[in-house]
UniProtKB/Swiss-Prot annotation:
Homodimer; the beta-strands of each monomer intercalate to form a hydrophobic core while the alpha-helices form wings that extend away from the core. It comes from Yersinia enterocolitica serotype O:8 / biotype 1B (strain NCTC 13174 / 8081). This is Translational regulator CsrA. The gene is csrA. The keyword Cytoplasm applies. A key translational regulator that binds mRNA to regulate translation initiation and/or mRNA stability. Mediates global changes in gene expression, shifting from rapid growth to stress survival by linking envelope stress, the stringent response and the catabolite repression systems. Usually binds in the 5'-UTR; binding at or near the Shine-Dalgarno sequence prevents ribosome-binding, repressing translation, binding elsewhere in the 5'-UTR can activate translation and/or stabilize the mRNA. Its function is antagonized by small RNA(s). One of its GO terms (cellular component) is cytosol. Belongs to the CsrA/RsmA family. Keywords: Activator, Cytoplasm, Repressor, RNA-binding, Translation regulation. One of its GO terms (molecular function) is mRNA 5'-UTR binding.
Length: 61
């Protein structure tokens, strides 16, 4: 895992097309902004896990 330190307003690049910007810090919460192409899915981890769980469940009609 790469660990980086960023200040509010600073950005990091993931590849050529994805940017992650620190928008603010309040207490133990960090607000980040993600810019990515439409074809790149961006989810919070708990939402991503829910999507994956729903995909693995058999569909009943």
């Amino acid at each position: 895992m790469l660990i980086l330190t960023r200040r509010v307003g600073e950005t990091l690049m993931i590849g050529d097309e994805v940017t992650v910007t620190v928008l603010g810090v309040k207490g133990n919460q960090v607000r980040i902004g993600v810019n990515a192409p439409k074809e790149v899915s961006v989810h919070r981890e708990e939402i991503y896990q829910r999507i994956q769980a729903e995909k693995s469940q058999p569909t009943t009609y």
